[in-house]
Amino acid sequence: MIQTNHRKRKNGTKTSSFGSPGRIGHDSSSFYASRLYEELPKENHVKYIENPILVETLDKIFCKSSEHMEELPDNSIHLMVTSPPYNVKKEYDEDLSLNEYRTLLKTVFKETYKKLVTGGRACINVANLGRKPYIPLHSYIIEDMLEMGFLMRGEIIWNKASSASPSTAWGSWLSAGNPVLRDIHEYILIFSKESFSRKRGSKKDTIAKEDFLEWTKSVWTFPAVSARIIGHPAPFPEELPHRLIQLYTFKGDIVLDPFCGSGTACLTALKDGRHYIGYDIESAYVKLANQRIKEYSNHRRYQK
């Protein structure tokens, strides 16, 4: 007797207005062809371009503005990771208006766009400011990046809850008079140049399976780092650039931080087996960054 297999083949899923619970042979073409996407930058199917950087330029921090990065060839950087100065009269900031501040960032990020390879990524850590009124910096940056032609890949919420005091509240105490929200998060905005993907070629990935599954979630939870420990008014923890470097670069790639401050992104790139290039206008912070990198390099040589 011939037995017939009556199991039905699963149909592929499609993106709808209310999402899709699974991803089986998923077809999202009709969704991305909808009018919702008409005015947004589109992925360009262009030839991959990558130009080499002089060896003497690699693994160096320049004490100058990143508004003009003539030391770098166009199409040479694989990843930008940065946290722009917050412009709240911290000692290294100028007192810029909001429009002047946005203009500065746009100038730097336009220059960064030129320096990124096809499919290169730009990751921007930003905190919103103020309460009277609240300034949604991350929204302004997204608007400006899209206007420049960057493709937005998503945003990560950095939950700093463990760094917040559980016994502190702002505004009217136990009253609807004027309760004030306390930000316990920052944003990490993720963009690409021209293409969402990069070809690996002979390069190696270095991210572990468990980390990939965890870090591709849109909420990351780890504490902030003390300014007193680092010696810089607004440092981010090494965990932040480490995750981005592991997710978005291959071993040996080049990481740029155009506002490198104390050099955390540069130091982390070195630890992760990548090259780095940094820029900062404050000589004291360039000195601090180089000192941190030197101490790590000396320690690594000693261990060998």
Tell what function each PLM region has:
Residues 291-304:
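PRPP-dependent phosphoribosyltransferase catalytic core
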Residues 1-288, 298:
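Core catalytic lobe of class I
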